[in-house]
Amino acid sequence: SLSADFAYSLTKISLEKLSIKTPKSALEGTAYLNYKRVDFKDFLNKVKFDVAIDKAHISANELNLFYNEFGAENVFYVATKIEGPLNNFKTKNLNLTDNFNSNIKGNIAFKNLFSTEDYEIAANFDELSSSYNQLIEILPKIIKKQLPSTIARLGEVSVIGDIKLSTTFLNVNCLAFTNLGEVQTSLELKNIQNIDQAS
């Protein structure tokens, strides 16, 4: 079910006091869609979203209906602000946890998630806590292809800093705390679409 104080004009849709409930998810916040009428022809790239998620729990199974990359049976607990069109949006002040005890706080930009072009994710983390095995549960198709399995040896990892990931490269500039110790790293991997041959 969806309820909101709804307003519509030729340039904006407003959904204030927004509440969305599905069988496995719930979300509270506000949403604005800003556009020119011609923008609907290229909805993914032109219609700009301005969304505040005050609190939500979102089923990965339900997200897979839109973006079939998430692991099954997970639930994300999230509060954030989202700005931009669906194919080039940013989360600001993201606070996200899940059933596998991963925790993300920071700002993340997503490009081309709904496109045939190479995707790119650029993140500035105040905190990213997870393990390789937890990440596989969250994004199994992406993580298994993009990150080498040797990272699993690090165990639980807490990261502060910048990470940029695309179809073909991984750039990391961060401070990481792991089960094996602490490391300040600046790393660039290319050719990660063939992760075992990455350099």
Task: Give the ranges of each region predicted by the language model.
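Extended lipid/amphipathic-ligand handling interfaces
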Residues: L2-T11, K17-I20, L27-L44, N68, ...
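Charged (often Lys/Glu-rich) extended helix/loop segments that serve as interaction or gating elements
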Residues: V51
